[in-house]
């Protein structure tokens, strides 16, 4: 059974599908907590399809989000701390100020999203897809990212992107645009990193750009 969930202000609309036909539909008026968040914590949300223009201020703490799709323009100010996120697809334009602290799962698809101020620290997201993402001011410290792909991702932060103490075994950073980063104390066995240098041309601070890349490479372990 598929559940299609639409979130609008305080109201959650749920349609239950069986064999591609609507079996029933319900609307729920959700109370918000003191911080103004809709609380969807500690729930089994397997096979849900979340839809909406903007999904904002929803708490998914410790919820089961296996085989879930988020289809919306934007997800903002949401919290997925300690959630299970196996086979989750984010068909969004932008994730802004979203927390994935200590989430666990595999095959999470963020491809072609703008990830703006997203905290992935201490999460386990093996075999995940960050292809063609624009990544700004986001944190990947202490992550397990085994065999994940960042192909043609753009790291656009003014400050360095941090992967400190992360497991980056077999991770592909293929043709990324990246001039700052910190890979201190990472596990980098079979890691592949190729940088798209096209930003060099026309860069006003060419010396600074090159120095930042050198500093980033210097943080890689000797066996990288």
Language model regions located:
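Tandem repeat scaffolds
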Residues: 2-12, 17-224
């Amino acid at each position: 059974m598929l559940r299609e969930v639409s979130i609008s202000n305080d109201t959650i609309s749920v349609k239950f599908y069986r064999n591609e036909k609507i079996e029933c539909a319900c609307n729920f008026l959700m109370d918000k907590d003191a911080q103004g968040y809709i609380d969807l914590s500690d729930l089994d949300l397997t096979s849900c399809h979340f839809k909406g223009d903007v999904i904002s201020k929803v708490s998914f703490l410790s919820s089961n989000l296996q085989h879930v799709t988020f289809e919306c323009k934007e997800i903002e100010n949401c919290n997925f701390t300690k959630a299970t996120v196996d086979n989750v697809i984010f068909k969004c334009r932008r994730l802004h100020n979203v927390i994935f602290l200590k989430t666990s799962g595999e095959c999470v698809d963020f491809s072609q999203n703008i990830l703006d101020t997203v905290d992935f620290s201490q999460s386990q997201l093996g075999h995940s897809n960050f292809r063609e993402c624009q990544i700004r001011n986001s944190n990947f410290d202490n992550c397990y990212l085994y065999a994940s792909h960042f192909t043609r991702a753009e790291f656009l932060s003014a400050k360095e992107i941090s992967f400190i103490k992360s497991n980056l075994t077999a991770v592909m950073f293929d043709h990324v645009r990246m001039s700052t980063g910190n890979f201190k104390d990472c596990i980098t066995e079979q890691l592949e990193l190729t940088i798209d240098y096209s930003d060099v041309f026309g860069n006003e601070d060419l010396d600074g750009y090159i120095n930042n890349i050198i500093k980033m490479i210097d943080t890689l372990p000797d066996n990288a």
